[in-house]
Amino acid sequence: MSKRVKGSAAQTSAAYFTAWQRGDLRTMATLVYQPPADFVTRHRSFSDDLHVQDIQLRPGAVKSTGETSAEVPFTGSRTLSEFGAWPFSGTLRLAVRDRTWKVLWAPETLDPRLKDGGTVRLAEFDGPAVELVTSEGDKIPNDSYAESYLAELKPEFDEVSQGWALESALPGQQARRLMTVEPKVSLERTTLSRSVQAAAARALDGVRDASIIAIRPSTGEVLAVADRLEGNYSAFRDFFPPGSTFKTITAAALLESGLDPAAEVDCPATYTVPNFRPIKNAGEQAHGRVTFADAFAYSCNTTFVREAVSRLSGDDLVETAAKWGFGGAKLATGLGGNCGRMDPPDGTNELAVDSFGQGSVEATPLCMAMVAAAVESGTLRVPRILSKAAAERIDGPAAKPVDLDEGAVAALREMMAAVVDHGTAAAAGLPAGVSGKTGTAEAAGGREHGWFIGYRDDLAFSVFVRNGGSGRSAALPVAARFLNGI
């Protein structure tokens, strides 16, 4: 090489890397052969657009590629404010131009992804700032059958959080994400229990048009809501005849009127209310002379009709139902919801059919789980699916807990235990310690809704199978799968 060439490839590359490290763009430009007019602006914009805080460069050894050309491989790392260290590598090419060693600059010298018109950009994207999780802080189980309820809750926590993506693209091609910082998400705990919710969901696998609601009686927290009801029905809001599960409330009214659980009553297959139609037991079964507790266990329609029309007025039944949540305001669960409703019976005939959960009596599956929880705890509490503060923010203050008649509640506990021990829920595969009440409700078109409500320790529940058949045939197997799966 001619001795008249100024400097060397090593000297020029070292000066270039030193200036680049310092951010001395103008000195860098003097070392480049025919730098583009926007050389300084291009470097500055690249750093500004990507929020580069600093750069570290590690040049390799100079490699000769000819008598008047050389190259220097290098690695580096840019620190981006959103991502931290972002490593890159490249090659600095040099050649003798005008008897001086110069840098042959190209866009890929700045960053290899800029070759062939490529671009690198920092993109912002929004994501939810809040994720609804179980009471334990875990993700809601997949296929939980609570998805529609969670989707309804999410707008109540509609804050957004910003995420960042570092993207590169070639002309005409889709951008590729190089690095991502997901939006920061805070966890909003629901009251749903992971294990209880999972058990409820799996119990409904393969079951159409059904729901399971589980509540913690001591607090009113909703532990599970698994809803496969069809036709946009909601287990929180829509009303259905509760059938014989309503006998829990009729029994409470009769107990408060003075009827003792041990009192002997008649349970004929059929009973005709004077000047009204005959009322029949399921399957027209007769149990003869039994205790009132066993009439409840056997779900004797005839007993309940006879005792209700002889001991209660329509107002008595309505007032008792009101104590148990019927006819009240919407429930401040965090998702709203209803309990039950009934019209004041107009005479003995309407009182008769209302007494076993037909006629004007309707309830939501949530309501009947609430009733079961009240038997276990002795207190009627409004269920909630969120923290007290969150539920109140969304729905307003919840009604205060109401303590129920201690004597009636104590008797109902024994009577619901008898249902499982030797009544309509006996030998159904339920785990030990379950108390409950079956229900079969007449529905349109001669069909039947199946119900089973109950509790075990500090867990109360309702199982509802719409148009599925009797409580024993449709709801009990689902309840057994649910409770055995917890």
Identify the role of each PLM range.
Residues 4-15, 22-71:
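Short solvent-exposed beta->alpha transition segments
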Residues 48-211, 219:
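Extracytoplasmic/periplasmic proteins that interact with beta-lactams or build/remodel peptidoglycan
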Residues 75-86, 426-456, 464-465:
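Short, Gly/Ser/Thr-enriched beta-strand-loop segments that form substrate-interacting elements
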Residues 137, 200-204, 220, 238-266, ...:
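Active-site SXXK
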Residues 236-245, 331-397:
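Active-site-proximal helix/loop microenvironment
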Residues 241-292, 298-301, 313, 324-328, ...:
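Short, glycine/proline-biased beta-turn/loop segments that scaffold the active-site neighborhood
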Residues 267-296, 369-433, 465:
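Conserved active-site-proximal loop/helix segments of enzymes involved in bacterial cell-wall
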Residues 278-280, 287, 313-353:
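Mid-domain, small-residue-enriched loop/turn segments at the edges of structured enzyme/sensor domains
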